[in-house]
Curated annotation (Swiss-Prot):
It is found in: Cytoplasm, Myofibril, Sarcomere, M line. One of its GO terms (cellular component) is M band. Residues 120-149 form a coiled coil. Residues 20-38 have a biased composition (Basic and acidic residues). May link the intermediate filament cytoskeleton to the M-disk of the myofibrils in striated muscle. PANTHER family: NEURONAL IGCAM-RELATED, TITIN. This is Myomesin-3.
Length: 1437
């Protein structure tokens, strides 16, 4: 690509003389061109024009001819090189045209043209004077031009031209300068002078060939993008020209209109995947999702497409396709087996669609009954008619070891959601006819597999089907008319009208199975529009009788499945049609039909082969089974050494190739394949050869990172990095090519592969620049060719500093650390290497930072304290006495992370007692080797260690462990694409532990799991037991008691369980004779152990007492006994409940309560639950004492005692106080006649166990003249007498009950104080009124009975201030005190006297007292009886 060139600087214009000459030459060329064209036109004319020019009238002298010749020579010499080039080009074109013309006529035409041109030239009219004047002017101009050109300042005939180039290519800037004398040339980059000596050798090359100036920039990098200027200067002046160079990163292989830049500018950015779809292992009935990330936003998200097995997927109720934030995802809310398959996502891109794919495997859901088979799949409805259809499905791949005996079919009508079992199909077939359906209704079906264990979960429901006459469409015809309109007519309209239908035809069996036959026939023709039904008849061959086939509903479709046929018999069938007018004649009988035998499953495929694919997958291929009944294949796998086959896929595979994902790297697997048909799953194929899961072998990728390690006069030492992808095999060697920059061809350095990555290249030319490239080779072949290296100058190194270290590599990469290793430089410089300087560069940074503050002496370094998740680049520089040398080639970016599944070195002791270090790498290629080193200083010493290598595992055994073996052991796995390495530092402390363990293994001791233990059994037996590790059947036990071996006896039983490692001694009745030491001596082969138990002194006495107590307790429990003894509980209502529970009772069992040895009838007992309950409503000191519950029957008795004295009683009262304190209500304020009362209600209060304290404004209050405090059983109060303003404020009541303290507060101020005072004043006034009010205090009875003729005297006491007015009432009427009635008042005593009472005096009397504060009436009823009539009241006395 080129950019518009830039002319010289604005201050350097061309000389005016040169511009004038250039215009003159251009004008002359144009005139000559017009003359040639005119001559050609004249020469081709048929007519020959003859005329005489004005020049023919003149005669030319010799001087004139000489002057014309000079003019011609001058003009020709003054032509520019561009005009000459155009003239030569025109001549070549004319010559080529002439060569293309052939034939005699063409030659004559050329002759005629030449003749006419000459004739025209000779006959041209010229003005002699004008010609002479022009010639003189030409000669004068040429002389002046020569004088100007002889000595002049520089100017650019051809300026620099801007360039845009790809990265790593070469650009050549050229220009032509004219000057006399030759100028001095200087090149600049962004106004900085270019000195090739200051740059890498061969970077810049500057040349000057007779005015042609050039600057060559090799291996362009992004940093070379700049403005380049060339300045020329001599004695007459100076000039400059500049051009821009743009270096672009290579983005694609195409160029021009197919280039990446053109596409990006035209179509937008390219969309690439930044993540990889991984295999998904979903489970039936559960959700799963797939997602992938893109490098750019997808402008049209709807253009992202998802496919399953090549079929386009769309969003639905169960499946959602989403796109957000550069992430496309497919989410399935409920997974079915039908969702299994190869999923592919396709995203459009300007350079063609980008695709990724992965496989989704769906495992069976958890069975409702363990061991039940998996669910069927692919349920489909075929041959749908008015009232019947054929249902098919695929059998499940996993029956869980139980053969399928049948299939249950469930039906759902419309969208009701109600599933009803409708049919059952035998287990040997996956096809079943469904009849009895309703025309016009829609149905869905699902299937369950049944085995002897149970039923599977249901399959996915079939698609919704609508029952109808699908032949009706065939009988309809569309007739177009009137520009696009159509009319639909039925052929039934053209048939003859019939009444009774004709018989059906072509009765035949469309399907014959083991359990049924599907009959089909053609409808009668003509059939008329009346709806038809059919009746069927069957006949056994040879019987001569016809039998009607019954059906639950009328047959409306020309299909019918016959289910009740007998095997080994042949049948013929015939059909009758029936409509509303009648029944047709029978059809012709069908051909003889018999049920088939049981369907056979398909044979397994042959030639099942397994091939390596990736680190976690294996590719399978097999020969196809050529059978039309084939539905697909099921694949099964198992690890080598196991017997159970695991299902790989649950949806039949249609092809003959499959990649099994999700396998464990390094493990060996076997595979088999089974054919699937409607008859079921066939037999398994032969198992494949065991295959280890590894990456398939491929050719390696290209080497890279070439570096110059040493250089002589005619030789170089080149190093490079290994391929990033080694192809799963060992690199056998490298092929190196070299290229001299001054030559065109590449030359091979070696014919045989170089085993190392360092090569010495000889026979080079000093001062030349060379570049190199290489290929790696493994067992798969020669890999990719690397890109050319940078140009290296072949110039002998003489600098005093050392050369670059090489082969800098990172290993043992973890989340925060890694280990760097490198090789020392090949060029030492002026002296030996004294150390190394290691620096690093963080991701995204251009600054190199030192790893350590000073140099290190070794060729390895552990770098720690790095940031997880970041990438780092490292480089190393060697140093000697002269200083730091050249830096090494930087490492590739190293990402710090803990890789999942990464292995570490295992340290332990084997079965023979040897200490070992082992490392396992399942992902290592087969050709890998385990390279062990100690302290990173090379191979291990074979005198001290022994190395054992197995498949994917290496083991280092220490022969004689000692202090010499301490250090850091590291291991690296070769030939792996990724870093597989680890290290372990063996310390002295760890070595001592391992040596101790080694001694134990070589001198084994039976491992003691549990020493001697003592248990007391239910009946009081004593069990002595100990547990050791599992022993062999040959193990021996010797039990020593008091230095004497004992054996089993009736009182002392000895048990020895070798399988469990259990030794036990059961002593029936422990006594003094069993006191002493028990020693168990165990021996199992070489292993021994001895365990001793001592039972003496207090230990034995305690054991003896416990055994006796246990024995007595066992005897107690032979009859009714207390399972739960007496215990107390305080309820929220402050009741005390005593409870206990009895067990082992019967109907005759008696329960009694006692208090202080006296039986209590108030106690309760529930025989059903065995619960006893005694409630104490209000506990007081009188309830203090001993409570006892007793249960008894003929088997024995038991009792339980609760002592409610002392601490137990205090605990109950404390609990009552706690509950009472918690029950306290918020403080209330109440006005009284004496003052203001503040109180709280409680459920219980006890002065001894509850303390109350009142506070006013946080100051404790004490009872006094104005402040009184008190409590009752249910209330705590504070009474303020004669309240004042100083009594306002916050009042707090603190209740303490044991450790429980509760505070209640209220604020006696503001409205609360005003309300209380108002109530106080009101009550006080009422009290005064009540005190002074007139009232009858006492004296009058309710009833007074008296005999006639007696005197009645009634006296009462009245009060009131002032003295009240007194009057008597009889039957609410005032009493007139005359004759026999008399009233007497003596102070507060009022008396009424009635003399000689009679029956008229009977009635209701009242004394009415009244003063200014109120009044009151005292009532009395007087009853007068006659002589001899004693009232009832007196009789009852």
């Amino acid at each position: 690509m080129t950019l518009p060139h830039s002319l010289g600087g604005a201050g350097d214009p061309r000389p005016p003389q040169a511009m004038e000459v250039h215009r003159l030459e251009h004008r002359q060329e144009e005139e000559q061109k017009e003359e040639r064209q005119h001559s050609l036109r004249m020469g081709s004319s048929v007519r020959r024009r003859t005329f005489r020019s004005s020049e023919e009238e003149h005669e030319f002298s010799a001087a004139d001819y000489a002057l014309a010749a000079a003019l011609a020579l001058t003009a020709s010499s003054e032509l520019s090189w561009e005009a000459q080039l155009r003239r030569q080009t025109s001549a070549v074109e004319l010559e080529e045209r002439g060569q293309k013309r052939v034939g005699f006529g063409n030659d004559w035409e050329r002759t005629e043209i030449a003749f006419l041109q000459t004739h025209r030239l000779l006959r041209q009219r010229r003005d002699w004077k004008t010609l002479r004047r022009r010639t003189e002017e030409k000669v004068q101009e040429a002389k002046e031009l020569r004088e100007l050109c002889y000595g002049r300042g520089p100017w650019f005939w051809i300026p620099l031209r801007s360039h845009a180039v790809w990265e790593h290519t070469t650009v050549l800037l050229t220009c032509t300068v004219q000057a006399s004398p030759p100028p001095q040339v200087t090149w600049y980059k962004n106004d900085t002078r270019i000195d090739p000596r200051l740059f890498r050798a061969g970077k810049y090359r500057i040349t000057n060939n007779y005015g042609l100036l050039s600057l060559e920039i090799r291996r362009c990098a992004i940093e070379d993008s700049a403005t380049y200027t060339v300045r020329v200067k001599n004695a007459h002046g100076q000039a400059s020209s500049f051009a821009k160079v743009l270096v672009r990163t290579y983005l694609g292989k195409d160029a021009g209109f197919d280039s990446e830049i053109f596409k990006r500018s035209t179509f937008g950015p390219s969309v690439e995947f930044t993540s990889v779809l991984k295999p998904v292992f979903a489970r039936e009935k559960e959700p799963f999702s797939l997602s992938c990330l893109f490098s750019e936003d997808v402008l049209d998200a709807e253009s992202i497409q998802w496919f399953r097995d090549g079929s386009l997927l769309r969003s639905s109720r169960r499946r959602k396709i989403l796109y957000t934030d550069r992430q496309a995802s497919l989410k399935v809310s409920c997974t079915y087996k039908e969702d299994e398959g190869l999923y592919m996502v396709r995203v459009p891109s300007p350079f063609g669609p980008r695709e990724q794919s992965t496989y989704v495997l769906v495992r069976d859901a958890e069975a409702e009954n363990p061991g039940a088979p998996g669910s069927p799949l692919n349920v489909r409805c075929l041959d749908v008619n008015r009232d019947c259809l054929i249902l098919t499905w695929a059998p499940p791949s996993d029956t869980r070891g139980n053969p399928i005996t049948a299939y249950t079919i469930e039906r759902c009508q419309g969208e009701s959601g109600e599933w009803i079992a409708c049919h059952e199909a035998p287990g040997g077939t996956c096809r079943c006819p469904i009849q009895g359906l309703v025309e016009g209704q829609s149905y869905r079906f699902r299937v369950r597999a049944i085995s002897r264990v149970g039923s599977s979960v249901p399959s996915k429901a079939s698609e919704l089907v609508v029952m109808g006459d699908h032949d009706a469409a065939r009988r309809k015809t569309e007739i177009p008319f009137d520009l696009g309109n159509k009319i639909t007519i039925s052929t039934d309209a053209f048939e003859d009208t019939v009444t009774i239908p004709s018989p059906p035809t072509n009765v035949h069996a469309s399907e014959i199975r083991e359990a049924y036959v599907v009959l089909a026939w053609e409808e009668p023709s003509p059939r008329d529009r009346a709806p038809l039904t059919y009746s069927l008849e069957k006949s056994v061959i040879g019987s001569g009788t016809w039998e009607a086939i019954s059906s639950e509903s009328p047959v409306r479709s020309p299909r019918f499945a016959v289910l009740d046929l007998e095997k080994k018999k042949s049948y013929v069938f015939r059909v009758r049609a029936m409509n509303q007018y009648g029944l047709s004649d029978p059809s012709e009988p069908s051909e003889p039909i018999a049920l088939r035998g049981p369907p056979a499953t398909l044979p397994p495929p042959a030639q099942v082969q397994a091939f390596r694919d990736t680190q976690t997958s294996v590719s399978l291929t097999w020969d196809p089974v050529k059978d039309p009944e084939l539905l697909g294949y099921y694949i099964y796998s198992r690890k080598v050494g196991t017997s159970e086959w695991q299902t790989v896929n649950n949806k039949p595979i249609q092809g003959t190739r499959f990649t099994v994902p999700g396998l464990r790297t390094g493990k060996e697997y076997e595979f088999c394949v089974r054919s699937v048909s409607e008859a079921g799953v066939g037999e398994s194929s032969a198992a494949t050869e065991p295959i280890r899961v590894k990456q398939a072998l491929a050719t390696p990728s290209a080497p890279y990172g070439f570096a110059l390690l040493n250089c002589g006069k005619n030789e170089m030492v080149i190093g490079w990095k290994p391929p990033k992808r080694r192809g799963g095999g060992k690199i056998l060697g490298y092929f190196l090519d070299q290229h001299d920059s001054e030559e065109l061809d590449w030359h091979a350095v070696n014919q045989q592969p170089i085993p190392t990555r360092v090569c010495k290249v000889s026979d080079l030319h000093e001062g030349h620049f060379y570049e190199f490239r290489a290929r790696a080779a493994n067992w798969a072949g020669v890999g990719e060719l690397s890109a050319p290296s940078s140009l290296f100058e072949c110039k002998e190194w003489t600098m005093p500093q050392p050369g670059p270290p090489y082969d800098v590599r990172a290993s043992e990469v973890r989340a925060t650390s890694l280990v760097l290793q490198w090789e020392p430089p090949l060029y030492m410089g002026a002296g030996p290497v004294t150390g190394y300087h290691v620096s690093f560069q963080e991701e995204g940074s251009e600054q190199w930072k030192p790893v350590t503050p000073g140099p290190i002496s070794g060729t390895h370094l552990r770098v720690s304290d790095l940031q997880p998740g970041k990438s780092y680049v490292f480089q190393v520089q060697a140093m000697n006495s002269a200083g730091l040398g050249q830096p090494s080639m930087p490492t590739d970016p190293v990402l710090l992370e803990d890789k999942p599944g990464a292995h570490e070195i295992e340290v332990g002791v084997d079965e023979e007692g040897f200490i070992y270090l082992a490392f396992e790498a399942p992902e290592a290629p087969d050709s890998s080797e385990f390279q062990w080193s100690k302290d990173y200083k090379g191979p291990l010493d074979p005198q001290r260690v022994k190395i054992e290598d197995k498949v994917n595992k290496s083991k280092v055994i220490l022969k004689e462990p000692g202090l010499e073996d301490l250090g850091t052991y590291s291991v690296i796995v070769t030939d792996a694409d990724e870093d597989i390495s680890a290290s372990h530092t063996l310390t002295e402390e760890e070595l001592e532990k391992l040596k101790k363990l080694s001694h134990e293994i070589r001198n084994p001791v039976i491992k003691l799991i549990s020493g001697w233990n003592i248990d007391i059994l239910e009946r009081g037996e004593v069990r002595l037991w100990l547990e050791v590790e599992k022993l062999s059947p040959a193990a021996e036990l010797h039990l020593i008691f008091n230095n004497k071996e004992i054996f089993s006896s009736p009182n002392r039983k000895i048990n020895f369980d070798r399988e469990k490692g259990l030794v036990e001694v059961i002593i029936q009745n422990l006594s003094e004779e069993d006191k002493g030491s028990y020693t168990a001596q165990l021996q199992d082969g070489k292993a021994k152990n001895q365990i001793t138990l001592t039972l003496v002194d207090d230990d034995f006495d305690k054991l003896l007492r416990k055994a006796d107590a246990k024995r007595r307790d066992w005897k107690r429990k032979q009859g009714p006994y207390f399972e739960r003894p007496l215990q107390w509980k305080v309820t929220e209502d402050c009741q005390v409940q005593l409870t206990c529970k009895v067990t082992n009772t019967k109907k005759e069992t008696r329960f009694q309560w006692f208090f202080q040895r006296a039986e209590m009838p108030d106690g309760q007992y529930d025989p059903e639950t065995g619960t006893g309950l005694l409630c104490i409503e209000e506990l007081s000191k009188k309830d203090k004492g001993i409570y006892r519950a007793m249960v008894s029957d003929d088997r024995g008795e038991d009792d339980t005692i609760l002592d409610l004295t002392g601490d137990a009683l205090d605990a109950i009262f404390t609990e009552l106080g706690r509950i009472g304190a918690l029950s306290a209500t918020p403080l209330k304020i109440q006005g009284t006649e004496e003052g203001i009362r503040i109180f709280s209600k409680v459920k219980y209060y006890n002065v001894e166990y509850m303390k109350t304290t009142w506070f006013h404004k946080d100051k404790r209050l004490e009872s006094g003249d104005r402040i009184r405090t008190g409590t009752t059983l249910d209330e705590i109060w504070l009474h303020i007498l004669d309240p004042k303003d100083s009594d306002k404020g916050k009042y707090t009541l603190e209740i303490a009950a044991g450790k429980e303290v509760r505070q209640l507060s209220t604020d006696l101020s503001g409205q609360a104080f005003e309300d209380a005072m108002a109530e106080h004043q009101r009550l006080k006034t009422l009290a005064i009124i009540e005190k002074n009010r007139a009232k009858v205090v006492r004296g009058l009875p309710d009833v007074a009975t008296i005999m006639e003729d007696k005197t009645l005297c009634l006296t009462c006491i009245v009060s009131g201030d002032p003295t009240p007015e007194i009057s008597w009432l009889k039957n609410d009427q005032p009493v007139t005190f005359l004759d026999r009635y008399r009233m007497e008042v003596r102070g507060t005593e009022v008396t009424i006297t009635i003399e000689k009472v009679n029956s008229e005096d009977s009635g209701r009397y009242g004394v009415f007292v009244k003063n200014k504060y109120g009044s009151e009436t005292g009532q009395v009823t007087i009853s007068v009886f006659k002589h001899g009539d004693e009232p009832k009241e007196l009789k009852s006395m």
